[in-house]
Design a protein with these regions (language model features):
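DNA polymerase processivity clamps
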Residues: 1-198
């Protein structure tokens, strides 16, 4: 099996899914690695630390890859000169080789990884439930759709990082919402205004 990505698509996977994977060696593999699920020239990539899940869909080229094939890869830094990323899967040896190629298709980096036992079926059910929730909200089934500037959301949450939990109070889709500490000993809050959706 061969899987090919343009470098910008593979970088998107690492940028979106990599930062939220767990760095704790005692966590399950599904929380320490990025899951790639392949469907007919589309890759759904998921990253999770057990408390949140990020997902991105990118195009890819598949050769001899069956639908719903799942592969776990570590968060990686992509070399700057990379133009294409190839993954060669050897199911017999239960390993894969990830290669970074430059403009002339010369290999500028290659790394081999072993499969985890139970891959992919043990991991598939975890993301099936997540996908149901992504679909539900993407289809407008959420109670409110609120658009916020991500910089303001991040800075609002930055001040609450020391709290064990936060409580988010919504009024309506056009009213500001309140993010406050769920910890009684720390009385802090932030009010965030929505931005207009076009």
């Amino acid at each position: 099996m061969v899987i090919k990505f343009k470098s910008n698509h593979f970088r998107d996977i690492m940028r979106i899914c990599g930062p939220i994977t767990s760095t704790c060696p005692d966590d399950r593999e599904i929380c320490r690695y990025i899951s790639l699920v392949f469907y007919y020239d589309v890759c759904e990539a998921y990253g999770s630390n057990g408390h949140q899940i990020s997902k991105v869909e990118v195009p890819c080229i598949l050769k001899n890859v069956y639908p719903r094939f799942t592969l776990l890869i570590p968060p990686l830094k992509v070399p700057p000169r990379t133009r294409e990323v190839e993954i060669h899967v050897d199911e017999k040896e239960k390993e894969y080789e990830l290669m970074y190629l430059d403009e002339e298709s010369d290999v500028i980096g290659a790394y081999k990884y072993k499969f985890f036992e139970g891959e992919p079926l043990d991991y598939e059910s975890f993301y099936i439930k997540a996908q149901e929730n992504f679909d539900k909200y993407n289809n407008g089934e959420g109670k409110y759709v609120i658009s916020v500037n991500p910089k303001y959301l991040i800075s609002a949450l930055e001040g609450l990082k020391s709290c064990d939990s936060v409580i988010i109070n919504f009024g309506s889709a056009v009213e500001p919402f309140l993010i406050r500490s769920g910890d009684e000993s720390v009385k802090t809050s932030a009010l965030l205004y929505p931005v207009r959706m076009t």
